[in-house]
Regions:
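Small-residue (G/A/S/T)-rich helix-start motifs and N-terminal tracts that mark the onset
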Residues: 1-126, 151-157, 172-270
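Short internal beta-strands
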Residues: 60-66, 137-140, 161-164
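Short loop/turn segments at strand-loop or loop-helix junctions that form parts
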Residues: 107, 164-165
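Short, acidic/small-residue loops that bind anionic groups at enzyme active sites
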Residues: 130-149
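A short helix->loop->beta-strand "cap" motif at the edges of active sites that frequently abuts
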Residues: 132-138, 156-159, 202-203
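A generic structural signal for short hydrophobic patches within well-formed alpha-helices
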Residues: 143, 167-172
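PIN/NYN-family metal-dependent endoribonuclease catalytic core
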Residues: 157-158, 166-168
Length: 270
């Protein structure tokens, strides 16, 4: 069994200060982000992701939404692009070419959530992930798609799962058949479990247990005490993670851990 490298980060002091100091100072060098999400019954996740990414300091963002949302979203966001949707208002398979083009443009992409449950959308999302070489951060109900279709994680680029502990339980139970993960684990047990899940899924994991935020990547795990119980943590963390990965693609573990610190600092400033 591979050993685990464990880093504890204080909410007042970054574990990787050099990364914080080297953050780009201009929009031109701050990365390009593609945000994907929404359906006729929900649009909050992609719009909130856009807002958080702007606060995090991303250079340029595009928000890809189903065309069925244009009449609503057009009044709320001016950077939206609208791709083919199904009759029920979810993403259609016909959107693949446009999404792949936008993913190629981007330094990272966040599949923010509010996709709804649609079989055609599931096919589209799997095709997008498998054919794109852009780092992808998955959140909200996108994690449920992955748990149902774990082959979505079989890709050449980095995949980051920003998942609740209950979603990780479902993922473990339905797909990777790892030892059970539970809410009553102590920190040492959870660190080992997250390391194993990350390696088994060939993805990075960000999750929350009580007020602790964990990052797991290729045998490395960090833990940061947020000292808050933020209900928006998934969308917010995914947005900050995507921004930091866009700017620091060669240092994923440090970037994701620093994204946690950065998001908590921004929360204090609000």
């Amino acid at each position: 069994m591979a050993s685990t490298s464990y880093t504890k980060q204080d909410h007042t002091e970054p574990a990787f200060p050099k990364l914080v100091w080297s953050k780009p100072e201009t929009k031109q060098s701050a990365g390009k982000l593609l945000i994907i999400g929404g359906n006729a019954n929900g649009i909050a996740a992609p719009l909130q992701s856009y807002d958080y990414a702007q606060k995090a300091g991303i250079g340029v963002s595009r928000v890809a939404l189903p065309s069925a949302l244009k009449s609503v979203a057009g009044k709320l966001i001016d950077t939206g692009t609208y791709v083919p949707s199904t009759p029920s208002g979810s993403f259609s398979k016909q959107a693949l070419a446009e999404l792949l083009e936008s993913a190629t443009w981007a330094d990272s992409m966040v599949l923010a959530g509010d996709f709804g449950r649609n079989s055609e959308t599931a096919v589209l999302l799997e095709s997008l992930l498998k054919k794109s070489n852009t780092s992808a951060i998955l959140s909200k109900d996108m994690i449920d798609y992955v748990a149902t279709t774990p082959t979505m994680m079989e890709r050449n680029a980095l995949t980051v799962l920003v998942a609740s502990l209950s979603q990780l339980q479902k993922l473990v139970r339905q797909s990777i058949k790892q030892p059970a993960i539970s809410f009553d684990m102590n920190i040492a047990q959870l660190v080992e479990a997250l390391k194993d899940i990350s390696i088994a899924t060939k993805s990075s994991i960000i999750t929350k247990h009580h007020t602790m935020l964990f990052v797991a990547h290729e045998g490395e795990v960090s833990a940061t005490d947020s000292r808050t119980d933020d209900e928006m943590w998934q969308v917010k963390t995914a947005a900050y993670a995507s921004e930091w990965l866009a700017q620091q693609p060669e240092k994923p573990f440090a970037a994701l851990t620093t994204a946690i610190f950065n998001s908590l600092q921004a929360e204090k400033a609000e």
